[in-house]
Amino acid sequence: MIEIRNLSQRFEGPRGWIEALHNVNLTIPQGEVFGIIGRSGAGKSTLVRTINLLTRPSEGSVFVGGRDLTQLSAAELRGARRDIGMIFQHFNLLSSRTVFDNVALPLELAGVKRAQIEATVLPLLDLVGLAAQKDRYPAQISGGQKQRVGIARALASKPKVLLSDEATSALDPETTRAILDLLRRINRELGLTIVLITHQMEVIKDVCDRVAVLDAGRVVEEGNVIDVFMRPHHEVTRALIGDVIAQELPPAMKARVAERLKTGSGHLLRLAFTGSGVDQPILSETIRRYELDFNILHGQIDEIQGRAFGSLAVLATGEPGKVGQAFAYLREQGVVVEELSYVE
């Protein structure tokens, strides 16, 4: 388990001190894939580098496996870091070494015997799908394969935690998907805790169990990925989700809806469904029960952690009393009802 307590990080800049992280508190259970997302400059990379103390925090504690890394001696910290692997956006492979030898490098530096190195590296190359490329050099393999080498190298010391700092941001969408599938498989098969830093909500949606949203060095939202998508509270979260699932009407549609609302009454709603709710005729039943009119303005269906997720923007009109009853009924069916505006 990883526990970050009251963590702050300050750097001295040309115009004074800069607070990169402010009073961050996070708990990441063993075996979880935990995402940390935010825009550029939010403090994501600074935060992930405090987990293995590549960056020592100005204040606070970092517990990994029950040990406070900030209180360890230099020798103890080197030992603790063997339990924490890390992969980066840039692959950092040695061009003069083969795929096998790049993965073997940390074991060689640790003084592991050659026979044990082979017994460790070959299964790792098989795990990441590079057994046939073990004798090739970095210049002879693709970007996605280079990242797989980086993953295998990070796993060579048999860590309990894997930190991923924007590991897919330089890859094309298809390769990104393959790397994320690999990380999820490693998580399942090895029981590895993965902390994944990204600015892409698509990555969070596809692979993470829980997510923390970082803005200006502060955690502004945290929760299960499906819950955060269903009920985003902070404006930064809404904006990030909007990169994947549209949360707002297109401008031209907004203008038409505004004109229409001026002539009558209505409720502009965002409805979010998940799981079996996507397959059920809930809107049809609501219309029949409460004699409402639903005009669907915008809709999208996606998948989060293997579960169907749907989002609709609708204009609802009807008798005021029945409208309130209809909203209550929808919520009873597990639908998230968010009123975007009301015009009378």
From Swiss-Prot:
UniProt keyword Cell cycle present: no
GO MF annotation terms: ABC-type D-methionine transporter activity; ATP binding; ATP hydrolysis activity
Gene3D superfamilies: 3.30.70.260, P-loop containing nucleotide triphosphate hydrolases
Compartment(s) where it occurs, according to its Swiss-Prot or TrEMBL record: Cell inner membrane
EC number(s) recorded for this UniProt protein: 7.4.2.11
Protein residues bound to ATP: 38-45
Membrane topology: Peripheral membrane protein
InterPro entries: AAA+_ATPase (IPR003593), ABC_transporter-like_ATP-bd (IPR003439), ABC_transporter-like_CS (IPR017871), ACT-like_dom_sf (IPR045865), MetN_ABC (IPR041701), MetN_ABC_transporter-like (IPR050086), NIL_domain (IPR018449), P-loop_NTPase (IPR027417)
SMART domains reported in the protein's UniProt record: AAA, NIL
Cellular component terms per the entry's GO annotation: plasma membrane
Main location, first listed in the record: membrane
CDD domains linked: ABC_MetN_methionine_transporter
Catalyzed chemical reaction(s): L-methionine(out) + ATP + H2O = L-methionine(in) + ADP + phosphate + H(+); D-methionine(out) + ATP + H2O = D-methionine(in) + ADP + phosphate + H(+)
ABC transporter domain span: 2-241
Keyword Transport belongs to the record: yes
Complex and partners: The complex is composed of two ATP-binding proteins (MetN), two transmembrane proteins (MetI) and a solute-binding protein (MetQ).
Similarity comment: family membership: Belongs to the ABC transporter superfamily. Methionine importer (TC 3.A.1.24) family.
Function comment: Part of the ABC transporter complex MetNIQ involved in methionine import. Responsible for energy coupling to the transport system.
Protein name, as recorded: Methionine import ATP-binding protein MetN 1
Name of the encoding gene: metN1
